[in-house]
Amino acid sequence: MNEIPYERVKIARDNGRPTGTDYIKNIFKNFIEFHGDRCYADDKAIVGGIARLNGMPVTVIAIEKGHTAKERSYRNFGAPHPEGYRKALRLMKQAEKFGRPIVCFIDTSGAYCGVEAEERGQGQAIARNILEMTTLCVPVISILIGEGGSGGALALAVADRVWMLENAVYSVISPEGCASILWKDAKKAGEAAASLKLMAEDAKSLGVIERILSENEIGKKEFYDRIGRLIKEELDELSRDTELVGKRYDRF
């Protein structure tokens, strides 16, 4: 049994899995990307903008890893800098101003931990997102599509509904990092993965997420159509809820 959680981690990290921009391209129409945080730069690890979902205007934000080595390098392997989180927050506040629901796709091993990111306020940027997301007056759905690593994932996951693909993972630390800290041996990553309760089934049983999304036909039109339909149905329901902020605040 201990082998199963770590196998899920390997699947979640697979280069062939659909990335954030794949979901944007195949689920939404008329996507217009916005760039920059208006403070420092444009972080390529986070893609965001406005689009339409079956005619509904939405703001969509995704942490993007890329598929090829060149794409992954360009996207910093899906590890956002502070300016990425600030860009995401700028888009969220804009969505709130214009009454647009927000959809986030999360796939990151964690926020970038380089010295330059720390100098530009990585911790503050993540904390600010978490704080501001609790008070957004529009519906928010966050979907973990691959890796959900620590605060780097949580900074886009303070939502009314949090979903996971069945082979996605969500954890405070990577199995390798946990094994290195607890046992000084990264080779015990499998044992660490089992202890971390990082699978979608674990997250649902603990009340961290509401729904596990089947990966049947993943990457095909039928898969994206199904995910898009579920998002639209949920947004329609959430849009009728007059107590979103209070419920979200109580949850987190």
Segments from the language model and where they lie:
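Terminal-region recognition feature
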Residues: M1-S180, K184-K187, A194-R251
